[in-house]
Amino acid sequence: MRKSRKYLLGLLLTGGLFSLSSCRHMEMSNDQWREIIQNIYPVDSIDSQHTWNLLQDKALTVRVKIADPNITTVQVLNGNPYITEGVEILAERPCTTGHYVSPTFKVPNVAPTLYAAAINSDGRYYVVPVDGANDVTIGGSRVINDGTLYQPTYQTFTYLFEEDYPFPGDFDFNDVVMRISQHAANDSTLKLTVTLAAVGATKQVGAAIRLPNINYDYVKSVTIDEGTRFDENYGINRYFISNDEIYSRGRDGSAVINLFDDAHWCMNAKEEMGQVVRMYYNTRKYEAENESAIVPAVSRTYTINMKSNVNAYYQSLALIDPFIIVSNNGLCVEVHTYRYKYDEAIWHYTNGSAGMDDRVPWALLIPDATFHYPVEGITMGMYRDGQISGAYSRYNHSFGQWGRNRSTSKDWWLYENATKAQVY
């Protein structure tokens, strides 16, 4: 935390902005809070209707009419896997020849070119372009099924978090960076893969994922494919997630996947004098002793076995609720994406928006598996007093302009719009 942020934090506390009614509960002075945030946030004149959403809904009916009797699955793809590497699976349903499926799914607001594919039991793909249609048939001369297949992977989102919520931070959105995908292994089994890509926080940070559409009572078991937790052998008492179980019941009754209690430990399981070593991991392009390090990302895949009440194929990645947990002013505070900003998955610490929603996110969902987040100390994008700057500041394709008007610069997050020296 920079000195200016420490000074502001002191003003917030000594000025009585926050009143504490318990160690887990805070109340905010609405007018003061709104004024401070609007004066500090990198974007002034924020769109009053902004939801910080980069996704849009799609629906497609796919009919399978090919001679192969061994078709088992239909997928909707964001590219042609016989031509392009890195194609993602946006939707997947069991299906056989002579039948159809009608999946709904999410795509980025910068809409990709869609393809539909039928896959047989040997993994052979029969692909057709969707061409903007709402109803497409896999069959006839349009089918592509020859050449080298680049195996598609499941749709992956990047989640970016600021550690200082509810206080203003530097808004480089790299304090914790996670990349998450999910898919159904069968009707009752959901696979959730989480990659911890970077930690730019200066203090201990925990994390979990709430599954708002899956009741805790509908889960039979959760296992980790790798056999160990993110923070296996963590030698210090757990602070944010006291339950040693892999999953637990959320405050609203939903299932919560407990990821880790200390992000730094997950990236580098090292202690000195009984304290976890805290450095910047993968947020600077150089290494500095005791300050920053470049390390491999860490991944875990969670297998969620569910009762018949839930069909895994109908669970949307866009609706999960990853969040981090931090300690601010003695409170255990959760940092959620804007959709779930005032939800409390594990801890109770606020009275909700209480009419003081300032339209400001402390976490972002980016619909890109390889999103290049800002390097340490560089804001995602700034637009104040007519000046545009930051990691994503290309004119008419900038984060700041999108913040002012949700209908413009919707492609700001594409790598082509980044200031390359300012992103990781």
Which functions belong to the PLM regions below?
Residues Q56-K58, S188-L192:
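Structural beta-strand segments of beta-rich domains
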Residues P94-Y115, N120, V128-G132, T137-I144:
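Short Pro-Gly-centered beta-turn/loop motif in secreted/extracellular proteins
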